[in-house]
């Protein structure tokens, strides 16, 4: 029996793989509309360090779910799921194809798998956990999470304060692991026929070279001034998800006089390479993904062939 669900394309890949360029080309070939799946591009005023599409690119191919939050605000995977589904329904209702593009794997997982029913935040408990984070350090709390919820600990970086504290909060409120609660939720059939593409260079050294080239281009384009403007606001701090974004955290520390320029660059590159490694690890475990070499001159033709084949 043929699948009658509307088509949606999911274009994933590590940072600096070239997803934006391919997505714009596919939008024109498929008659689609782009939806950003990037937890950094949601923030207004954070353009250079997030490699946000340029004004010219956005005029040619608008991206939904870009510039939807102030850097002082938070945005959960559950909120992303609600927003993305609404955008996908709107695009499909116009007879066009939703093209989701980005590398925030937690957003993608929550979009497809759904969001577990979790207890509401407990202000008193969160305050206590924040105090422990300050006194004991995030690494110590991550070790604790590894003992009580190894599944969640595997997916949460030790320095991702927001997600780390939330996982511990859920465990202390329910006595159950996040992974257990996720596994219990009923998985509904996703309303779209989803074609999943992973874009990445075949060689790691090629990706690392691109990461370095892009980081240096950001510095030349005024990344330092962009972060300085964020600091000058006075209401932002390094505990916020926006300021913890790769590159922003390292530049923030540099502007506070904690590191010199060379150290900032070295740490920024290291953090970006670590992010790319985590993204690739996650993608290798993704069921049914089609891998495309980002260096292939016919990458968009390969994707179109995969899409056409998925409908038969």
From Swiss-Prot:
Q: What is one GO biological process annotated to this record? A: tRNA modification
**What positions are marked as the site Interaction with substrate tRNA?**
104, 126
Where do the coiled-coil regions begin and end?
Answer: none
**Chain residue ranges for the region called Interaction with substrate tRNA:** 38-41, 162-166, 244-249
Q: Per the UniProt record, which EC number(s) apply here?
A: 2.5.1.75
- One Pfam match: IPPT
Q: Which residues bind substrate?
A: 15-20
Which residues hold ATP? 13-20
Q: Name the catalysed reactions.
A: adenosine(37) in tRNA + dimethylallyl diphosphate = N(6)-dimethylallyladenosine(37) in tRNA + diphosphate
Recorded superkingdom: Bacteria
What are the names of the required cofactors?
Mg(2+)
Asked if the record carries the keyword 4Fe-4S, the reply is no
Query: Which one of the record's GO molecular function terms can you name?
Result: ATP binding
Q: Which UniProt keywords apply?
A: ATP-binding, Magnesium, Nucleotide-binding, Transferase, tRNA processing
InterPro entries, from UniProt?
A: Dimethylallyltransferase (IPR039657), IPT (IPR018022), P-loop_NTPase (IPR027417)
Q: Which PANTHER family match?
A: TRNA DIMETHYLALLYLTRANSFERASE (PTHR11088:SF60)
Functionally, this protein is described as follows: Catalyzes the transfer of a dimethylallyl group onto the adenine at position 37 in tRNAs that read codons beginning with uridine, leading to the formation of N6-(dimethylallyl)adenosine (i(6)A).
Q: How does it assemble?
A: Monomer.
Family membership, please give it: Belongs to the IPP transferase family.
Identify this protein by name.
Answer: tRNA dimethylallyltransferase
According to its UniProt entry, this protein's organism is Chromohalobacter salexigens (strain ATCC BAA-138 / DSM 3043 / CIP 106854 / NCIMB 13768 / 1H11)
């Amino acid at each position: 029996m043929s699948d009658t669900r509307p088509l949606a394309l999911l274009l994933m890949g590590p940072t600096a793989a070239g997803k934006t360029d391919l997505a714009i080309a596919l939008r024109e070939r498929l008659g689609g509309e782009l939806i950003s799946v990037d937890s950094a591009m949601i923030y207004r005023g954070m353009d250079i360090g997030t490699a946000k599409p340029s004004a010219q690119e956005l005029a040619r191919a608008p991206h939904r779910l870009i510039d939807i939050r102030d850097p002082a605000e938070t945005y959960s995977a559950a909120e992303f799921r609600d927003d993305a589904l609404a955008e996908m329904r709107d695009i499909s209702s116009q007879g066009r194809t939703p093209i989701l593009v980005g590398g925030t794997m937690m957003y993608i997982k929550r979009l497809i798998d759904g969001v577990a029913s979790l207890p509401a935040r407990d202000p008193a408990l969160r305050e206590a956990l924040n105090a422990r984070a300050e006194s004991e350090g995030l690494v110590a709390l991550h070790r604790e999470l590894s003992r009580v919820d190894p599944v969640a600990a595997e997916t949460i970086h030790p320095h991702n304060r927001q997600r780390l504290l939330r996982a511990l909060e859920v465990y202390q409120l329910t006595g159950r692991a996040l992974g257990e609660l996720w596994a219990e939720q009923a998985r509904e059939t996703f309303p779209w026929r989803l074609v999943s593409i992973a874009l990445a260079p075949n060689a790691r050294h090629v990706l690392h070279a691109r990461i370095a080239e892009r980081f240096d281009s950001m510095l030349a384009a005024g990344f330092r001034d962009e972060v300085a403007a964020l600091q000058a606001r006075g209401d932002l701090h390094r505990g916020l998800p926006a300021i913890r974004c790769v590159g922003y955290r390292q530049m923030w520390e540099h502007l506070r006089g904690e590191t010199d320029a060379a150290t900032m660059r070295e740490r920024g590159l290291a953090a970006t390479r670590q992010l790319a490694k985590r993204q690739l690890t996650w993608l290798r475990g993704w069921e049914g993904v089609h891998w495309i070499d980002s260096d292939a001159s016919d990458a968009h033709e390969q994707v179109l062939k995969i899409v056409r084949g998925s409908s038969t």
